[in-house]
Amino acid sequence: MAALRAVLLAAGMLALAAGPARAQRTARTEDFLGVTRCDSGQAVTEIREDVRRSDLQAEIEAHEAVHRQQAAAYGGCEAFLASLTTARRIIESELPAYCAQWKVAVARGADSSATRLDYAWRISAQSGAMENRLDIARRFRDECD
């Protein structure tokens, strides 16, 4: 028993010496199929080259178009992006964008329920609110038809 405690203590000390654990690296632009960013006060969308040559292009364009509209309605691109600081705000901005994307995907033949659930999980992950994924799935079902 003493040997086990010594091993656990040594492992704990090693973990502390290694520094804080990181679950994942910081997201980069190339991690996303499309990104809307600000350029001289205007919302500008960039879609990855591999997506522009695929069937996903229309879905991603629909999604990012919502973000451009949100930025314009918010009173400016920088102000809109600066407002995305909480899980609630991220969910509020992503839900209509994924809804637009879902409509295009379903029109192309994607399974409605499975795609809706997949997008709800993505919103949950992006917002850092995985514990709310069932609520987000319900909202997606109720608000996106």
How should each PLM-predicted stretch be described?
Residues 90, 102-145:
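Long, well-structured alpha-helical subdomains associated
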Residues 19-23:
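Sec/Tat signal peptide C-region and signal peptidase I cleavage site
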Residues 55, 71-101:
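Post-HEXXH active-site segment of zinc metalloproteases
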Residues 59-72:
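Active-site recognition of the HExxH zinc-binding catalytic motif
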Residues 6-17:
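Bacterial N-terminal signal peptides
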Residues 45-60:
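Short pre-active-site segment immediately N-terminal to the catalytic Zn-binding motif
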